[in-house]
Amino acid sequence: MAVNDCFSLTYPHNPHPGDLIEVFRPCYQHWALYLGDGYVINIAPVDGIPSSFSSAKSVFSTKALVKMQLLKDVVGNDTYRINNKYDTTYPPLPVEEVIQRSEFAIGQEVTYDLLVNNCEHFVTLLRYGEGVSEQANRAIGTIGLVAAGIDIFTFLGLFPKRQGAKS
């Protein structure tokens, strides 16, 4: 599904246990894994702020709590879609194993890092046995481009020299 195919809770498609749920927040996506009966597993900051706001704070946290929550509470007023986008690259684990792994993780405190251990890494690890995040890879690429640009400007002498420096 393309981003234009996002749907809201008013007209939801029916996710199946083990499906990855992509929630569209302003400026980024939050990820959860559907468990069934309206529940998802996801990671949220350790403090108890509301689910629909917790993902923004988690970007700046180093600790997160694995939670089982209602999909509607995690989504809030945002939109979401089912997005099992890595199925062609990584074969999904059997649903029973995904659910078992998920249930074991509920309530655990985990390390959170936007670039190497974020909510997308968490749910893809449950579904595929591999923690993958396209969103983190894009962020790493952007950081690399900015750093390279600064190096080029510095090398070419385009940044002004410090005042009072001897030539």
UniProtKB/Swiss-Prot annotation:
GO terms for biological process: ether lipid metabolic process; lens fiber cell differentiation; lipid catabolic process; N-acylphosphatidylethanolamine metabolic process; organelle disassembly; peroxisome organization; phosphatidylcholine metabolic process. One of its GO terms (molecular function) is O-acyltransferase activity. Belongs to the H-rev107 family. This is Phospholipase A and acyltransferase 1. Residues 20-135 form the LRAT domain. The keyword Glycosyltransferase does not apply. The chain crosses the membrane at residues 139-159. The active site is at H30, C119 (acyl-thioester intermediate). Its EC number is 2.3.1.-, 3.1.1.32, 3.1.1.4. GO terms for cellular component: cytoplasm; cytosol; endoplasmic reticulum; lysosome; membrane; mitochondrion; nuclear envelope lumen; nucleus. Residues 160-167 are lumenal. It catalyses: a 1,2-diacyl-sn-glycero-3-phosphocholine + H2O = a 1-acyl-sn-glycero-3-phosphocholine + a fatty acid + H(+); a 1,2-diacyl-sn-glycero-3-phosphocholine + H2O = a 2-acyl-sn-glycero-3-phosphocholine + a fatty acid + H(+); 1,2-dihexadecanoyl-sn-glycero-3-phosphocholine + H2O = 2-hexadecanoyl-sn-glycero-3-phosphocholine + hexadecanoate + H(+); 1,2-dihexadecanoyl-sn-glycero-3-phosphocholine + H2O = 1-hexadecanoyl-sn-glycero-3-phosphocholine + hexadecanoate + H(+). It comes from Rattus norvegicus. Residues 1-138 are cytoplasmic. It comes from the Eukaryota. It is found in: Membrane; Cytoplasm; Nucleus. Keywords: Cytoplasm, Hydrolase, Lipid degradation, Lipid metabolism, Membrane, Nucleus, Transferase, Transmembrane, Transmembrane helix. Disulfide bonds: none annotated. The keyword Transmembrane helix applies. The gene is Plaat1.
